[in-house]
Design a protein with these regions (language model features):
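A generic structural signal for alpha->beta connector loops
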Residues: 49, 94, 125-127
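Hydrophobic faces of well-ordered beta-strands that scaffold small-molecule active sites
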Residues: 65-67, 97, 129-132, 156
Length: 163
C-alpha cells in the first residue's frame, strides 16, 4: 500500500537517525517519497495540488515499528481487530507492526498466516508482519511447521504469553 498525495511539511524538527538528520526543516513529500528537504521551501515554486502542514514545534520522522503488538484477530475480535489495531498504530506514528501469535486459532500454520496477511491488506492501514508460533497451539510440545509458514512470508516466531 503505497501512500499517495503531495504534502509540504513546514518548519518541523526533522529527525532521522539513518540519515543523521536532527534539525529544523521543511519537507516535500510526493506519493510517499521525500523529494526535497531544506529550510524555507518556496511554495510558489511548487506545482499545484499540494497540502501544507504546519509542523512548528512538532517532530517529523520516519514511521515507527512496533515489534510486539497484539491485534487479537482471529478469535478475539471483541477486544480488537486488525482494522482497529492498525488504525491505532497509525495514529501513534507506527507504519509497521508485528502481531503476536496469541490469537484463536494461534498463528501456527500457513492458513492463519495467510489470513493475517489478507486481512491486513484489505482492512489494515499500516504494514502488518505476523509472528508465528514456535510450537503448535503455543503449547510447547510439538514444533510448528516453520518452513511452511516461512513460505507465506512469515519472518519471526514466538510462543508469546497471553498478554
Amino acid at each position: 500500500m503505497k501512500p499517495t498525495g503531495y504534502f509540504l511539511i513546514k518548519s518541523g524538527h526533522l529527525i532521522d537517525a539513518a540519515q543523521d538528520w536532527d534539525f529544523r526543516s521543511d519537507v516535500l513529500i510526493k506519493n510517499g517519497e521525500i523529494t526535497v528537504s531544506g529550510c524555507n521551501i518556496d511554495e510558489d515554486s511548487l506545482e499545484q495540488g499540494f497540502t501544507t502542514i504546519d509542523a512548528s514545534g512538532l517532530v517529523v520522522s520516519p514511521g515507527f515499528i512496533d515489534i510486539h503488538a497484539h491485534l487479537r484477530e482471529p478469535g478475539f475480535e471483541y477486544k480488537e481487530t486488525i482494522a482497529s489495531g492498525t488504525k491505532a498504530a497509525a495514529k501513534g506514528g507506527f507504519t509497521t507492526i508485528s502481531c503476536m501469535p496469541n490469537t484463536d486459532p494461534p498463528i501456527d500454520n500457513v492458513s492463519v498466516v495467510n489470513f493475517i496477511h489478507d486481512r491486513a491488506r484489505s482492512d489494515g492501514v499500516v504494514r502488518v508482519l505476523p509472528i508465528g508460533c514456535v510450537t503448535k497451539g503455543r503449547l510447547g510440545k510439538e514444533l510448528a511447521d516453520m518452513e511452511e509458514m516461512a513460505s507465506a512470508c512469515l519472518l519471526y516466531t514466538s510462543d508469546a504469553a497471553d498478554d
